[in-house]
Amino acid sequence: MRIVFMGTPDFAVNALQSLYDGGHEIVGVFTQPDKPQGRKMVLTPPPVKVCAEKLGLTVYQPKSVKTSEALDILKSLNPDLIAVVAYGKILPKEILELPKFGCVNAHAS
């Protein structure tokens, strides 16, 4: 099954790791853009990006998923399922309808 994973914080890392360890085909990982953090405002990648890169997965960091560019990327990945875990953005209808088996969302709140 071709899975696109969408997540950002530490909370989402275990889900990504579990999908990977389960042998699922993760065709792309979407996460929020790197952002300045701390007193020195050092540009810092989200935890999901760090994990995905360690696993050798392709990472996408669009500022918005509501652009034609982001939609085109998702279409090209041809996902069967999109797994969303604390991504931090509301997905538009076009994305929700894209995968063959739909989207699954988990959030800590």
PLM regions: where:
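One-carbon transfer enzymes
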Residues: M1-S109
